[in-house]
Design a protein with these regions (language model features):
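Hydrophobic alpha-helical transmembrane segments of multi-pass integral membrane proteins
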Residues: 1-403
């Protein structure tokens, strides 16, 4: 008898093998669909006439929808790698995906009653992530998991507050909780960038991986997240606009300091380093402009926050998609052209969204934000087109998301 060759695994088996394979495409699809729906199909409104303004539904869906799926994929992939413990697979990942998907149903139409189900679903996956990281930290206390656990816990609390405000119909509380959730996500971004940037930069500087020439100053690792935490605490206690404005500027400057760390010689022009530093640049610029707005600058805070949350978080998420999508599918750097093109499209979309309101660019003809939303959607779809063959193919030994 001849030995039967191994059967090709099903698509579900491949996607369920690792968190990023399932959740990065989900995040990309949601990130492409939702802003396009809201700006062009819904015309900045919502199908249902609920208690919450459409803009709050929009912000909630971006933070806990697009970025939330990216977060689930990253945490369920990176934490096992950092702790050298088995990663969640199969049913666990699909259960998280189901919880995340249910949470998105209410956001598609802005219905208050469906919001109850969405609240339960979002709280479920948020708390599950916190419990998962805590369990791994207990099992491997020597691994540096306090910072991710701290910021994840803060995001879970902010998410519960957002959903609670939606259920109560409290617009002011919802607005405040969404802002805090976005800031907490920026703090988490600072932690992730610190973990990801070092191995990526060292791989670029020494592809043989025999040395580690890039060693950022230890004191700078938590500077940006620490100052973002100060902003969050100030927002919670309700300090004056002037005080919170100066704190925002300080946090933005700390992200700018990350950009300075990216100057590692001629390799600083590599797309991978430019992408990661651009995330810090947009985060920093947005926070600084938000702070100056609170100090009386002649523009609103909203476009500045879009630079930080749409730009800093968006480019950071897409950078991780592009880099980890190679490392965890048996490939390596440099980034393929489609990934570079997707990143360029995303930065363009962010600038088209924010700069007209800041008075830097003239308003373009057509529906407000339509072009920015279209280019934003194209960025995610271009990345997905390039990486879907990698993510949907059987697993190969790859690199990683950090040390």
């Amino acid at each position: 008898m001849h030995a039967r060759p191994d059967a090709t695994p099903s698509l579900a088996a491949v996607l369920g093998d690792e968190g990023l394979r399932l959740f990065f495409p989900l995040a990309a699809l949601h990130g492409a669909l939702w802003p396009f729906l809201w700006t062009i199909i819904y015309n900045l409104g919502m199908p249902a006439d609920g208690a919450m303004p459409p803009s709050l539904w929009h912000a909630t869906e971006m933070i806990f929808g697009t970025y939330g799926a990216a977060l689930i994929g990253f945490i369920t992939t990176a934490i096992p790698e950092w702790t050298d413990r088995p990663r969640p697979k199969g049913r666990v990942l699909f259960a998280l995906a189901a919880s995340w998907t249910v949470g998105r149903v209410a956001g598609l139409i802005g219905d208050d009653m469906l919001g109850i189900l969405g609240a339960l679903a979002d709280c479920t996956w948020l708390l599950a992530l916190v419990a998962y990281v805590a369990r791994n930290w207990i099992a491997r206390p020597q691994v540096r998991l306090f910072a991710p656990l701290f910021w994840l816990s803060g995001l879970a609390v902010a998410g519960i507050a957002v959903r609670g405000a939606f259920l109560l119909g409290d617009v002011d509380l919802a607005h405040e909780a969404i802002l805090i959730a976005g800031l907490v996500f920026l703090g988490l971004l600072g932690v992730v960038l610190a973990r990801v940037t070092v191995p990526v930069t060292n791989l670029i500087l020494d592809p043989s991986e025999a040395t580690s020439p890039y060693r950022p100053h230890p004191g700078r690792i938590n500077l940006a997240p620490g100052l973002v935490l100060a902003v969050v605490l100030a927002q919670i206690v309700g300090v004056s606009p002037a005080v919170s404005g100066f704190l925002l500027i300080a946090a933005g400057a700390a992200f700018m300091d990350r950009v300075a760390e990216a100057f590692v010689g001629r390799e600083a022009s590599r797309p991978e380093i430019l992408a990661l530093s651009s995330s810090s640049l947009l985060s920093g610029a947005g926070l600084i402009l938000a702070g100056t707005s609170r100090l009386g600058a002649p523009f609103a805070e909203t476009p500045a926050l879009h630079l930080a949350l749409m730009g800093g978080l968006g480019v950071g998420v897409l950078s991780v998609f592009a880099i980890a999508g190679l490392m965890h599918t048996g490939r390596t750097l440099p980034l393929p052209r489609l990934a570079v093109g997707a990143l360029v499209l995303m930065v363009s979309a962010v600038l088209l969204r924010a700069l007209p309101e800041l008075g830097v660019l003239p308003w373009l003809p057509g529906p407000p934000y339509a072009l920015a939303a279209t280019i934003w959607a194209a960025a995610f779809l271009v990345w997905l087109k390039g990486y879907w063959p990698y993510l949907s193919s059987p697993n190969k030994a790859g690199g990683g998301c950090g040390d």
